[in-house]
From Swiss-Prot:
Designated gene of the protein: LCE1A
Keywords attached to this entry: Keratinization
Tissue specificity remark: Skin-specific. Expression was readily detected in adult trunk skin, adult arm skin, fetal skin, penal skin, vulva, esophagus and tongue. Not expressed in the cervix, rectum, lung, colon, or placenta.
Amino acid composition bias (Gly residues), ranges on this chain: 96-110
Stated name of the protein: Late cornified envelope protein 1A
Organism: Homo sapiens
Family: Belongs to the LCE family.
Function of the molecule: Precursors of the cornified envelope of the stratum corneum.
Induction cue: By UVB.
Length: 110
């Protein structure tokens, strides 16, 4: 039995060397998940109003992820709507909706 043990120690198994390849998929990890929130100054281009990414940008007064009227993109929409800086504070379907001067659900939801 001592001979068999010495032979096993002398002969390394061939499965140990190619076990881990030198090339690991590390660069695929960082770009796996894109940022959840868009830039503060960017709003979605909706026909009636855009969605704000933050409460401090785009003239949105509701807290995080509310909808506002894209008053800075008035040249894009030919229809002249009431450009108020107020947002709908009442969530509809888990998200705030854009509205007119009174905050009615007349715009898109985010």
């Amino acid at each position: 039995m001592s001979c068999q043990q010495s032979q096993q120690q002398c002969q390394p198994p061939p499965k140990c060397t190619p076990k881990c390849p030198p090339k690991c998929p590390t660069p695929k990890c960082p770009p796996k998940c894109p940022p959840k929130c868009p830039p503060v100054s960017s709003c979605c281009s909706v026909s009636s109003g855009g969605c704000c990414g933050s409460s401090s940008g785009g003239g949105c007064s509701s807290g995080g992820g509310g909808c506002c009227l894209s008053h800075h993109r008035r040249h894009r929409s030919h229809r002249h709507r009431l450009q108020s800086s107020g947002c709908c504070s009442q969530p509809s379907g888990g998200s705030s909706c854009c509205g007119g001067d009174s905050g009615q659900h007349s715009g898109g939801c985010c």
